[in-house]
């Protein structure tokens, strides 16, 4: 894809900011197709377990909250001023999933060695068919466009290792994960199965009330106790697991004696919660600090799909559903 086309897409998307809101930006179907096919090729040339270096900024779920994505870049610096890793869940629930994913794909194409995207459980046809992205694509474009995005999502990497010490994924650990090579060897393109390693990396959750592995309230994958985090870090000589996938009140929350952190980057999630959003900055010495997007007072009318206009579970210590 020609650089000038990507530059133009980025310029138009960044130009959507209109005070505290963002205007809709209607890219052409041809532009979306170019973004998806170009990004897909880049994803497949890079490993499924990315090996990255600090300094880097890590963001959790954004869920179509495009104005908040722009706020993250205002806080952290627009690429390439900083390196970024996003932990998935770019689409669904919010009302500007198309703009959100298109800006992220455009940045990935333009700065492929400095800007990284992992797959979340919502980058999956069976999930985003229900929770809003399909409806947004169909209303604004066509079902064909949704399928183009699906093909791209099936090629996203699923985990990242920062300086061989911080392991990042969307969901969490898996009882099937014994060696990091098992992540490297997950084939792509792939749909997300309903069980197994790929499923767990995108769906599992920590649970402070259990030891070992437990049933997950989501009806998919497992929960895991602090003992499993400690055991995994010791076995693989790691310092920290960094994941997203759950709404947490302050935008970030530690678990297992600060050996795992949850990051969630969509403040006022779904227009219903009072949660803050956060971004984690990892410096050269692997010291982690947090930048917070405060929750706004006003709760807007949100989005497309199954949960539009419906209250969810309030964020709790330990996290609501992401």
Curated annotation (Swiss-Prot):
It is an enzyme of class 3 (hydrolase). Signal peptide: none annotated. Keywords: Acetylation, Cytoplasm, Hydrolase, Manganese, Metal-binding, Nucleus, Protein phosphatase. GO terms for cellular component: cytoplasm; nucleolus; nucleus; protein phosphatase type 1 complex. Its EC number is 3.1.3.16. The keyword Lyase does not apply. Residues 304-316 have a biased composition (Low complexity). It is found in: Nucleus; Cytoplasm. Binds 2 manganese ions per subunit. Its cofactor is Mn(2+). InterPro entries: Calcineurin-like_PHP_ApaH, Metallo-depent_PP-like, PP1_catalytic_subunit, Ser/Thr-sp_prot-phosphatase, STPPase_N. PROSITE patterns: SER_THR_PHOSPHATASE. It catalyses: O-phospho-L-seryl-[protein] + H2O = L-seryl-[protein] + phosphate; O-phospho-L-threonyl-[protein] + H2O = L-threonyl-[protein] + phosphate. GO terms for molecular function: metal ion binding; protein serine/threonine phosphatase activity. GO terms for biological process: protein dephosphorylation. Belongs to the PPP phosphatase family. PP-1 subfamily. PANTHER family: SERINE/THREONINE PROTEIN PHOSPHATASE (PTHR11668), SERINE_THREONINE-PROTEIN PHOSPHATASE PP1 ISOZYME 3 (PTHR11668:SF442). This is Serine/threonine-protein phosphatase PP1 isozyme 3.
